[in-house]
Amino acid sequence: MKLRVRLQKRTWPLDMPEVEPTLGQLRAYLSQALPTWGYSSDARFAITLNNKDALTGDEETLASYGIVSGDLLCLILEDAIAAPNLPSSTVSEHSSVQNNDQPSLATSSSQSNIQDAQLHDSLQGQATQSEVWNDDSVSGPGQHFEAEAVPDVVDVEEGTGYYLAEPMLCSESVEGQVPHSLEILYQSADCLNPCDALIVSIHLLMLESGYIPQGTEAKAVSMPQNWRLGGVYKLQYTHPLCEGGSAALTCVPLGNLIVINATLKINSEVRSVKRLQLLPESFICKEESGENVAMIYKDLQKLSRLFKDQLVYPLLAFTRQALNLPDVFGLVVLPLELKLRIFRLLDVRSVLSLSAVCRDLCITSNDQLLWRCLYLRDFRDGSIRGRDTDWKELYKKRYKQRKEAQRGRHVMFLPSSPHPIPFYPSPLHPRPFPPSSLHPPGIIGGEYDQRLTLPYVGDPINSLIPGPGETPSQFPPLRPRFDPVGPLPGPNPILPGRGGPSDRFPLRPSRGWPTDSRLPFM
């Protein structure tokens, strides 16, 4: 039978050769497997299906509990088991006592060592008991148990999850939570102002980067001796990867800033490497000065990234270069496989920029597999290419074609100027001559009359030379535009060939306006 065993948020497989194993056999197999999972073979545990109710009866088969191959079993360690949540047989089996005055499982932690020795002896020589727990006490022949009230344990994994949620590094800090190492350093440093608190965090960042405080008296749980003298902070370190060289940080407060100067000492020669300015107010809360260290610091993730990227790592790289040592970190020392996986996520400009850094990155950036991946990513090409295809040249060719096509579309759809030059034609506009701003469009005397455009409506002579009466043509006469502010369109007695006034269009001014006697064409 194959089962899955879950213990403290981790799951392992368990194989048993028996077809129908019993609970006792399962317990024996689990005891043998615990050392391989990182636990002691003497660890006491309870077998459950729902992580709460323990299974009892070692002689019962697993099938009687409804357990089949592939099921998930949850183990609860003895230390996290509460007395009210377990059946009587399991509790008595794990906590049987030989003395009359021995306390129950819920006693204080000061007697836990004595209980462990007695519980281990009782597990080997005592069978399963069947006493029943009633309320707060259990009585037996010659034995009196007094059960104390113990709060129910909801989930043994909650305690483990709490400790895992605590940040270990400054880069993992969130609001309200800081690493435990920072709390210890801050409490041992006796900080007097925000600058002191910032230097404490900087010292911890140096320790996280692998630097060791110089001097045998320096400890990781406290600040180095004489780190604060006369308003100037001095910290000295060595690094295991830079034997023969030492680094020193000199921090000087200047107004609201702290200037950090990093120097390198090799063979009594001191070189200035880096300089960084930090604002304590950005990372230290002034109003918080209590014992809660988590409320004093803020934006530790930003501080860690800024300090390490701009000072720590460049200092380490410069030290190894000064000692004529090869690089041990960074993009250059990564395997080729990892470089290609990183390069293929970049755009072409970034890849070309990396190729100009050094010879090694130039060789990596010219890999044909990389350019094939970039070509298939950036261009749609379903054609089959040969094995001898130069993918970089092909990418360059297609890239130039795309740029030329984009440039052609840009010229073709070039928008017209929003403010054309007055009195000059615009060659890109459908109407080269801009309209006059003196009259609105459609008004007599405007653009229509200045540059007259007559459409072809039929007879070019009869349609333009009206005679008496209606024009005897099969095409309608060319009528001029009407004046929207003048009289309504209709028969005009002044124009020849239009007829006289009628009842529908009387010859009278409209709305107080005089009759417009101007000719329609100027």
Curated annotation (Swiss-Prot):
Residue positions of motif RFDP motif: 481-484
Sequence segments annotated as region (Important for interaction with CDK6): 128-168, 380-522
Region feature (Important for interaction with PINK1): 91-128
Predominant location: cytoplasm
The UniProt record lists the keyword Cytoplasm: yes
Keywords noted in UniProt: Cytoplasm, Methylation, Mitochondrion, Nucleus, Ubl conjugation pathway
Gene3D superfamilies on file: 1.20.1280.50, 3.40.1000.30
Residues where Asymmetric dimethylarginine is found: R518
Record-annotated F-box domain positions: 328-374
Annotated GO biological process: autophagy of mitochondrion; positive regulation of autophagy of mitochondrion; protein targeting to mitochondrion; protein ubiquitination
Biological role: Substrate recognition component of a SCF (SKP1-CUL1-F-box protein) E3 ubiquitin-protein ligase complex which mediates the ubiquitination and subsequent proteasomal degradation of target proteins and plays a role in several biological processes such as cell cycle, cell proliferation, or maintenance of chromosome stability. Recognizes and ubiquitinates BIRC2 and the cell cycle regulator DLGAP5. Plays a role downstream of PINK1 in the clearance of damaged mitochondria via selective autophagy (mitophagy) by targeting PRKN to dysfunctional depolarized mitochondria. Promotes MFN1 ubiquitination.
Assembly and interaction partners: Part of the SCF (SKP1-CUL1-F-box) E3 ubiquitin-protein ligase complex SCF(FBXO7) formed of CUL1, SKP1, RBX1 and FBXO7. Interacts via its C-terminal proline-rich region with DLGAP5. Interacts with BIRC2. Interacts with CDK6 and promotes its interaction with D-type cyclin. Interacts (via the N-terminal Ubl domain) with PRKN. Interacts (via N-terminal region) with PINK1. Interacts with PSMF1.
Name by which UniProt lists this protein: F-box only protein 7
Organism of derivation: Bos taurus
Gene name of the record: FBXO7
